[in-house]
UniProtKB/Swiss-Prot annotation:
Protein name: Sensory neuron membrane protein 1
UniProt xrefs under Pfam families: CD36
Region entry Disordered, spans: 507-536
Glycosylation-annotated residues: N66, N213, N226, N440
Polar residues biased stretches: 514-529
Length: 536
């Protein structure tokens, strides 16, 4: 019986130790190893196929700020804005001209985005709505020349009247024309001023313009970006080092940007936003390089979350204040002069796009309150305007996300151009976009069955082993207690003999004491008087 109790004790203790080590140490390492072998950009893997051509469209929303009092604003009044949208598009992403470098463990490719108008999701909007915005070319050109080439102002002013006859500070046109189909740019004039201005169109410096013939171009905000090359990336495949999966190492065949006056701001940090490495630490954030704004942005951990019953973590993004971080002073016009830094929650895009544009979260959410107060019609709030992503860390899977960004004109009066002489100086919102994704059950089930069922199995197994081990330990303790409680308490013979001897001595002592007391009583005078009285 003693042997069985010891076997039960050893088995239960060993089971408890095994459950703890296997459940919290061994199994997670095995699972991470299996994921690291599956989640790579090596040709022939499922992840490579999904990454190369997204098998489902992302949702792309455009919200436009319609200026309802353009004539008043041209005379210096406060702008009144009306948000119109969303205009909804299906965004398809794919990569082409892929070249692998096995030695460097990288893959180079060109990114392509294709936007298809979704009439049903956009309804009742059709895309033919008339929108009033600051003139898409006159205002940016006038402001840029005033800031950077003031000596050419007279020449450019004349050129604008030739290329855009009868143009005013604000332009009214159809949404689809402004954003995709294009506005006509007439470079047919033989005047020197017009030819000087049109040079930037012929040389391709205006990337949003498409040449239609020898003398005409079409300019639009997004037309040239639709189904066209968005730039060549080189990223890590993650075969040799899984933690480098998707990391951007080159863009446009360059190892860093040259848009900003400091090395820190020109570095690539993170991925191209279409893939993330597994096993990230939540405090490290999610970083991605965005060519449209020439900058890497990081979303930071906010809280725990869930998606379709699966645990996740939520990250959100804040452009912050470049003044408060010395490493970000290179995003100022002059890193040595903080007065040249953009307002809190914004980013100056001029060094990136060549025009007076400001990026921020929609409605200036989390930006300097003065920006919101400068115009009418804004209502910043977290639900509609925050950037967020619900992310599964172990597999590196984004469950759902909303990437939102607003583009505004850094407007100011331009003395040399008559229609712009009385404009107010402020940052005027133009439009904002949202790129959203919500994984459907087809893809969430892939994560669920390959990851979470394994985690649930591990959880069930380890707790079953631990519970059975604890029951075994308690049973062993009870058996040992029962054995101890049933033992007979028997004195050794020597102790019994000595105890009897002591008892005899005590009894003999008592007898002698009684005899002595009796003799003393008998010898006392009058001891028998009571007997005589009883006789009478």
């Amino acid at each position: 019986m003693q042997v069985h109790r010891m076997k039960l004790l050893m088995g239960s203790g060993g089971g408890l130790l095994f459950g703890i080590i296997f459940g919290w140490v061994i199994f997670p390492k095995i699972l991470k190893f299996m994921i690291s072998k599956q989640v790579t950009l090596k040709p022939g893997t499922d992840i490579r196929d999904l990454w190369s051509a997204t098998p489902f469209p992302l949702h792309f929303y455009i919200y436009v700020f319609n200026v309802t009092n353009p004539d008043d604003v041209a005379r210096g009044a406060r702008p009144q804005l009306q948000e119109i949208g969303p205009f909804v598009f299906d965004e398809w992403k794919d990569k082409f001209d892929l070249i692998d470098d096995v030695v460097e463990d990288t893959v180079s490719y060109n990114m392509r985005n294709t936007f298809i108008f979704n009439e049903e999701a956009s309804s009742p909007l059709t895309g033919e709505e008339i929108i009033t915005l600051p003139h898409p070319l006159m205002q940016p050109i006038g402001i840029t020349v005033q800031r950077e080439r003031a000596a050419m102002m007279e020449l450019i002013s004349k050129a604008l009247t030739l290329v855009f006859p009868d143009a005013t500070a604000f332009y009214s046109g159809k949404f689809m024309d402004i954003f995709f189909r294009g506005l006509d740019v007439d470079c047919s004039s033989e005047e020197f001023a017009a030819k000087a201005l049109c040079t930037v169109f012929y040389t391709g410096e205006v990337k949003q313009a498409k040449q239609m013939n020898q003398t005409h171009f079409l300019f639009s905000f997004m037309g040239q970006a639709n189904h066209s090359d968005a730039g060549r990336f080189t990223v890590c495949r993650g075969v040799k080092n899984n933690m480098k999966l998707g990391k951007v190492v080159k863009f446009a065949d360059e190892p860093e940007l040259d848009a900003w006056p400091g090395d820190e701001c020109n570095q690539f940090v993170g991925t191209d936003s279409t893939v993330f490495p597994p096993g990230l630490k939540r405090e490290a954030g999610l970083w991605a390089f965005t060519p449209d704004i020439c900058r890497s942005l990081g979303a930071m951990y906010q809280r725990k979350s869930s998606y379709h019953g699966m645990p996740a973590v939520r990250y959100n993004l804040d452009l912050g204040d470049v003044r408060s971080d010395e490493k970000l002073h290179c995003f100022c016009d002059d890193p040595e002069d903080l007065d040249t830094c953009p307002p809190r929650g914004t980013m100056n895009l001029a060094p990136c796009v060549g025009g007076p544009l400001i990026a921020s979260l929609p409605h200036f959410y989390k930006a300097d309150p003065k920006l919101v107060a400068a115009v009418d019609g804004l209502n910043p709030n977290e639900k509609d305007h925050a950037v967020y992503i619900d992310f599964e860390l172990m597999s590196g899977t984004p469950f759902q996300a909303a990437k939102r960004l607003q583009f505004s004109l850094d407007m100011e009066p331009v003395e040399g151009i008559e229609p712009m002489q009385k404009l107010p100086k402020l940052i005027l919102p133009l439009f904002w976009v949202e790129e959203g994704v919500h994984l459907n059950k087809t893809y969430t089930n892939m994560v669920k069955y390959t990851l979470f069922l394994g985690l649930k199995f591990n959880s069930g197994l380890r707790w079953t082993i631990i519970t059975m081990s604890l029951v075994g330990l308690m049973s062993t303790a009870y058996l040992f207690y029962q054995q101890y409680d049933s033992l007979d308490i028997t004195m050794p013979p020597k102790i019994i003999k000595e105890s009897n001897k002591v008892a005899d001595e005590v009894e003999s002592s008592k007898s002698k004491t009684i005899e002595q007391n009796s003799s003393i009583t008998t010898s006392l005078p009058g001891a028998n008087q009571s007997h005589h009285k009883d006789r009478y």
